[in-house]
Design a protein with these regions (language model features):
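N-terminal Rossmann-like NAD(P)+-binding domain of SDR-like oxidoreductases, especially those catalyzing
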Residues: 1-133
Length: 133
C-alpha cells in the first residue's frame, strides 16, 4: 500500500491500521514539509517496523518523474491519497498554492496511475473544507 499524507492525522491512523493487518506500507512525504512527523515517530523508531514493513519516500506531488519511478518500482495494489492542504486559514492566504498542491497534485498522481500496467485501487480522501463548510 502507498499512502500520501502519511504524516497527517488520518494517514498515521491508516498506517497503524494497515500495519496491524500485516500490510507493507510505503508513505510519500513532501520534501518541503514543515509539518511534524510526530504522529508516526513511534513507528519510525521501531526497528521491527521501520524499513521492514514501513518505508518513507520523499517526493512532492509536482515531481512527476520521481513519483512515476516510485510507483513503477513499488507496483502498489492500493494507493490511499490523503495529502492535501489541511490548514483552512492558510488555504485562503495562499489559494493558488493550495489549488496547485491539492487539485493538480491529485491530477498528476491519477495520470501516472492511469498509465501503469497494473493500475492499483485508488482512494482519494478529501475534506468538507473543499466546499467551504
Amino acid at each position: 500500500s502507498l499512502i500520501t499524507g502519511i504524516t497527517g492525522q488520518d494517514g498515521s491512523y491508516l498506517t497503524e491500521w494497515l500495519l496491524a493487518r500485516g500490510h507493507v506500507v510505503h508513505g510519500l512525504v513532501r520534501r518541503s514539509s514543515q509539518i511534524s512527523r510526530s504522529r508516526i515517530d513511534h513507528l519510525t523508531r521501531d526497528d521491527s517496523i521501520y524499513n521492514q514493513r514501513l518505508f518513507l519516500h520523499y517526493a512532492d506531488l509536482d515531481d512527476v518523474t520521481t513519483i512515476r519511478r516510485l510507483l513503477v518500482k513499488l507496483a502498489p495494489q492500493e494507493i490511499y491519497h490523503l495529502a492535501g492542504q489541511s490548514h483552512v486559514g492558510l488555504s485562503f492566504e495562499i489559494p493558488e498554492s493550495t489549488c496547485e498542491f491539492t487539485a493538480m497534485g491529485t491530477l498528476r498522481l491519477l495520470e501516472i496511475v492511469r498509465d501503469l500496467d497494473m493500475p492499483p485501487k485508488f482512494l482519494h480522501v478529501g475534506s468538507s473544507e473543499l466546499f467551504g463548510c
